[in-house]
């Protein structure tokens, strides 16, 4: 990671759990961001179950946020970022009678997370996963009875956050394509309520009972782009009054299939600890042909609290590539920006430009990446 701050205190308990991009020789840059998404601190609820009957999809439509940005122009080296913002969808459902059980079948055009009464549903990450963008989307169905208010007349809030990954970003869009393959993120879902008298009601996404809009702390997110997270902003499910009427999305005309066995989960049992952590500032030995070598100011022991001053860069080397997410604790003033930059290798050879190095020896080499940048603005 890289941090070029104002002052920040970080506790060096960096861990990696199998999931995302490569080795994080974490370069943190205090103007930057950490990959968190809206899972911050919330307990995961709901139980993944078999899908509802396909016929119930007829009670729903794909909906999008009317104010969502659309990337225009040919996708190339200077125009490749996904649209900014996360699309949020919120609805309140009133129980006609006492509820015996509740299931929610959902699908997304983009990476999505769902919530019931503000609680994150499902442990899967990067839902719905990679499929042929035009032919297939995967659905996820959960038993949500335990997080529902089941009394007659009780009101429950359903919500979803959808970002462009797998749909409106570079991972599915070829070069020189006019705009992204997917124009706007979308959400679709059907709630099954089984009442205590045995009757069943299906409630789907529609234009009358749902609100939608760009909201929440995730201000940018895509598979290759990384994620920008502003912790000062409330989650979208708490911003219902700022959302507007959704619009029907007819971009996807393929088939929705239940996700069965191809889900991605966090693996805490595969936690990976850093092999070396150091803070550097300044360079020596640089020339026209060489970037030079970093000046290491201090190495950091496991468990040690790190204080970074302006101009300093912290490198956390995990010693290998991994599909993973970095985890660490930090404190800083409100408005501080923390940037976490992943890297697959370190620059070496005194930063020889002839060898394809992009910085001084000992710094993170990022030239071969598609510039993923993760981060968080502290609240």
Q: Where are each of the predicted segments found?
A:
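C-terminal motif of bacterial Sec signal peptides marking the signal peptidase cleavage site
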Residues: 34-37
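Extracellular/oxidizing-compartment recognition motifs
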Residues: 40-379
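Sec-dependent N-terminal signal peptides
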Residues: 26-31
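Bacterial N-terminal signal peptides that target proteins for export
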Residues: 15-25
């Amino acid at each position: 990671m890289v941090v070029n701050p104002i002052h920040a205190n970080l506790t060096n308990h960096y861990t990696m759990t199998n999931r995302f991009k490569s080795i994080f020789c974490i370069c943190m840059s205090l103007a930057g961001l950490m990959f968190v998404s809206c899972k911050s601190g919330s307990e995961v609820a709901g139980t993944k179950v078999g899908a509802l009957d396909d016929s119930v999809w007829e009670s729903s439509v794909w909906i999008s946020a009317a104010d969502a940005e659309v990337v225009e122009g040919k996708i190339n080296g200077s125009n490749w970022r996904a649209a900014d913002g996360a699309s949020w969808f919120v609805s309140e459902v009133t129980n006609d009678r006492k509820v015996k059980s509740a299931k929610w079948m959902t699908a997304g055009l983009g990476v999505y997370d769902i919530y019931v009464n503000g609680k994150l549903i499902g442990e899967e990450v990067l839902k719905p996963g990679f499929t042929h963008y035009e032919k297939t989307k995967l659905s996820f169905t959960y038993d949500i009875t335990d997080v529902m208010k089941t009394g007659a007349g009780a009101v429950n809030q359903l919500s979803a956050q959808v970002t462009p990954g797998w749909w409106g970003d570079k991972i599915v869009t070829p070069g020189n394509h006019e705009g992204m393959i997917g124009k706007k993120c979308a959400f679709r879902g059907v709630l099954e309520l089984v009442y205590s008298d045995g009757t069943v009601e299906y409630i789907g996404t529609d234009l009358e009972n749902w609100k939608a809009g760009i909201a929440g702390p995730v201000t940018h997110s895509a598979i290759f782009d990384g994620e920008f997270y502003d912790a000062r902003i409330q989650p979208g499910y708490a911003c219902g009054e700022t959302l507007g009427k959704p619009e029907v999305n007819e971009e996807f005309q393929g088939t929705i299939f239940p996700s069965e066995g191809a889900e991605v989960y966090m693996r805490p049992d595969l936690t990976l600890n850093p092999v070396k952590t150091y803070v550097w500032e300044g360079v020596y030995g640089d020339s026209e042909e060489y970037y030079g070598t970093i000046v290491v100011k201090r190495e950091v022991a496991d468990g040690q609290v790190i204080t970074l001053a302006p101009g300093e860069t912290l490198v956390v080397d995990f010693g290998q590539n991994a599909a993973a997410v970095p985890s660490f604790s930090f404190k800083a003033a409100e408005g501080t920006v923390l940037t976490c930059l992943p890297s697959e290798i370190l620059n070496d050879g005194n930063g020889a430009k002839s060898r394809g190095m992009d910085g001084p020896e000992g710094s993170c080499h990022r030239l071969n990446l598609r510039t993923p940048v993760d981060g968080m603005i502290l609240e």
